């Protein structure tokens, strides 16, 4: 096959066509919600509000800011571990996220906040759009280094669409609880990406094996992403929870789960090395699995010790996955998972879904209180036949729906991305920035250089 990686026309045309289409659609459909509209002044009078502090902005913006940093800085830098793919990891993540949030505002708006004429946008819409793009960033990790930016734009277009449909089915039809997105974001994104990676299997990827590794400095850059994600994950899991106790509880639960996950990941990483040394791959990734696994139950009454247990289990499973499961997937199933998203997002996402089903099924008035139970699960008076067991079954069904949507959608999108005209690199040039980026030339000598002749290099 002849590979043509020149994107001079393909990438500009794809970006400009998509953006022009988005501008037209925003012009027709998107308007401000009341909290962002000049009529808010009148709304305050109608609702007898004396201050602007009741505006949704003041409740949601801190969480939105944290989630936004996670998407663009956290995920971007987490994938810079490849020694010659740092530009692409951060740059392509920036590209797909910027496109994805615009398309997500439209898709999620049509399905969830369309008033018959317009999509009304507020800060919660922006957070949900970031969540949607988070799922795309997860899938990007599975195909990192093996796809072109044009392929990523196409993948984002389809994945955002499928994510929005899946989210609507789970949250609006099945009415599951998934505030931190264990099922809708992580499990869906991971298995969608893994399925695409399976369809795009490269039999000669070993020709680029040398570049599919890290260096001391690239691992440090990736650790920056890990720390941003780890610090802000409580905001991620609580960002769209109900005001008050639910949001407060989600932050506490996530905090505890992440802390426990770090200790178990470090313990397993050392125990699995014959000399007891730590593997930076485990520290960068498995330490975050507790936030993923707690996502579905973040705002539920799992209690702090339950959060610690979830983090404990996710840390063990994720670390074991990096050691044993990733090589098995590549050698036996031909799934080339660059970032190990199966271990960080896939399996912990399933654990989170299972934890959600169990936690919902054992909910009771003694634990929540009568009003608290109704508020936590959104029980209306019309739901006379609601029961914790029924909610648990819906939670389990939601997990299966997410996995099915991911697998079927991944196959379809993978087949589309296999077409040879998207500018993808040949197997021997994967994981290489120079294929798509202008790379500055490295200086031949590290000696001091200056146009000032008074400054001389040190003598040898």
Swiss-Prot record:
Keywords for the protein's UniProt record, in alphabetical order: Ammonia transport, Cell membrane, Glycoprotein, Membrane, Transmembrane, Transmembrane helix, Transport
Posttranslational mods: N-glycosylated.
Transmembrane segments: 10-30, 62-82, 90-110, 126-145, 152-174, 180-200, 220-240, 252-272, 286-303, 307-329, 347-367, 397-417
Catalytic reactions on record: NH4(+)(in) = NH4(+)(out); methylamine(out) = methylamine(in); CO2(out) = CO2(in)
GO CC annotation: apical plasma membrane; basolateral plasma membrane; cytoplasmic vesicle; plasma membrane
The organism's place on the tree of life at top rank: Eukaryota
Name used for this protein in its record: Ammonium transporter Rh type C
Organism this protein belongs to: Bos taurus (Bovine)
């Amino acid at each position: 096959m002849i590979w043509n990686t020149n994107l001079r026309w393909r990438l500009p045309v794809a970006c400009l066509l998509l953006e022009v289409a988005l501008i037209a659609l925003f012009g027709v459909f998107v308007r401000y919600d009341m909290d962002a509209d000049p009529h808010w002044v009148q709304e305050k009078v109608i609702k007898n509000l004396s201050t602007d502090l009741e505006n949704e902005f003041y409740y949601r913006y801190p969480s939105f800011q944290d989630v936004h940093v996670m998407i663009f800085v956290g995920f971007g830098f987490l994938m810079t571990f490849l020694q010659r793919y740092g530009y692409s990891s951060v740059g392509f993540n920036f590209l797909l996220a910027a496109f994805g949030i615009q398309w997500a505002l439209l898709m999620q708006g049509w399905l969830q906040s369309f008033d018959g004429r317009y999509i009304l946008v507020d800060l919660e819409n922006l957070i949900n759009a970031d969540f949607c793009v988070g799922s795309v960033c997860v899938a990007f990790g599975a195909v990192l280094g093996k796809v072109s930016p044009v392929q990523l734009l196409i993948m984002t277009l389809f994945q955002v669409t499928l994510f929005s449909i899946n989210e609507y089915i789970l949250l609006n039809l099945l009415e599951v609880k998934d505030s931190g997105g264990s099922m809708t974001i992580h499990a869906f994104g991971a298995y969608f990406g893994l399925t695409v990676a399976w369809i795009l299997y490269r039999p000669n990827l070993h020709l680029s094996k040398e570049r599919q590794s890290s260096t001391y400095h690239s691992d440090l850059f990736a650790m920056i992403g890990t720390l941003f994600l780890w610090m802000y994950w409580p905001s991620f899991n609580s960002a769209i929870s109900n005001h008050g106790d639910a949001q407060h509880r989600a932050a506490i639960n996530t905090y505890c789960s992440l802390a426990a996950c770090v200790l178990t990941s470090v313990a397993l990483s050392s125990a699995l090395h014959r000399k007891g040394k730590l593997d930076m791959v485990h520290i960068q990734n498995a330490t975050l699995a507790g936030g993923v696994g707690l996502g579905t139950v973040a705002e539920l009454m799992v209690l702090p010790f339950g959060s610690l247990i979830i983090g404990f289990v996710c840390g063990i499973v994720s670390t074991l996955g990096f050691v044993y499961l990733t090589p098995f997937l590549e050698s036996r199933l031909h799934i080339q998972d660059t970032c190990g998203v199966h271990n960080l997002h896939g399996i912990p996402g399933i654990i989170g879904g299972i934890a959600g089903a169990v936690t919902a099924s054992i909910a009771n008035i003694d634990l929540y209180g009568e009003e608290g139970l109704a508020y936590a699960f959104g029980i209306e008076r019309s739901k006379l036949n609601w029961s914790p067991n029924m909610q648990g079954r819906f939670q389990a069904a939601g997990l299966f729906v997410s996995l099915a949507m991911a697998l079927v959608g991944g196959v379809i999108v993978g087949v589309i991305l296999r077409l040879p005209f998207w500018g993808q690199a040949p197997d021997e040039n994967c994981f290489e920035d120079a294929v798509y980026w202008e790379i500055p030339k490295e200086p031949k000598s590290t000696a001091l250089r200056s146009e000032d002749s008074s400054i001389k290099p040190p003598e040898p």
